[in-house]
């Protein structure tokens, strides 16, 4: 009986640890830089040790809002933005998820080198830093509850 109880406690501890602060997997609200309003929700998943992100919801006053990626130059041109994978195959490097051309901005159709990490002081915030050469811009996404 004690052995079974210990196994259950250890299993619960492992589950809690997997969902502890710093876990990047889940849904994140993206914030419009200009308005400060929530723009979309991106669901981040891990598969085969790599990180992926898909737009699962868009916010707009128009209930029929369902835009296409008109600025994309590749196989995503003309595809719906909702359901689009915008984070592709990032790898973990020293506590940050990184990738060359790892994130797509569907507003302009451009790919950027990227680093993504959960904020150390507030695990409800995700720092998403896009790079062009040495120049970068960091957005803060908010964990969906």
Regions found by a protein language model. Give the residues of each.
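Sec/Tat signal peptide C-region and signal peptidase I cleavage site
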Residues: 16-21
């Amino acid at each position: 009986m004690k052995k079974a109880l210990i196994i259950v406690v250890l299993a619960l501890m492992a589950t809690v640890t997997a969902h502890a602060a710093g876990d990047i997997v889940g849904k994140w609200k993206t914030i419009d830089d200009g308005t400060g309003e929530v723009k979309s929700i991106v669901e981040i998943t891990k598969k085969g040790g790599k990180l992926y992100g898909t737009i699962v919801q868009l916010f707009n006053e128009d209930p029929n809002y369902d835009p296409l990626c008109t600025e994309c130059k590749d196989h995503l041109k003309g595809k719906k933005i909702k359901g689009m994978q915008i984070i592709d195959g990032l790898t973990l490097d020293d506590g940050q998820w990184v990738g060359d051309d790892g994130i797509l901005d569907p507003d302009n159709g451009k790919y950027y080198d990227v680093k993504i990490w959960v904020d150390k002081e507030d695990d409800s915030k995700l720092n998403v830093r896009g790079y062009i050469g040495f120049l970068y811009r960091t957005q803060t996404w908010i964990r969906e509850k």
